[in-house]
């Protein structure tokens, strides 16, 4: 059995990411690959039940916010939302 997690990005979210600069796209991809690699390496997380709670997030260049969830059942890092950080 493999411990590898895959990254899942919906078509609509892929389109939003695709409209960004190359450096933003690269940073998003790097972060998601790192999260997937870390999730696959964590044996404790694989045995823990999927908890329903607030989704996790990270920021790229202080201007973009990415919400994601780690689904241990399907072994995926699922991107839930991507967008510009609201001003304020």
Where are these regions (language model features)?
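Enriched for short, Lys/Arg-rich terminal
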Residues: 1-7, 15, 19, 23-30, ...
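A short, surface-exposed loop/turn module that caps and links secondary-structure elements
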Residues: 33-60
């Amino acid at each position: 059995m493999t411990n590898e997690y895959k990254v899942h990005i919906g078509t609509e979210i892929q389109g939003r990411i695709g409209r960004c600069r190359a450096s933003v796209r690269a940073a998003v991809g790097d972060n998601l690959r790192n999260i997937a690699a870390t999730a696959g390496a964590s044996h404790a997380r694989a045995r823990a039940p999927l908890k329903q709670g607030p989704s996790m997030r990270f920021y790229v260049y202080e201007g973009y916010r990415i919400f994601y969830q780690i689904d241990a059942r399907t072994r995926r890092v699922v991107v839930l939302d991507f967008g510009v950080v609201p001003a304020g």
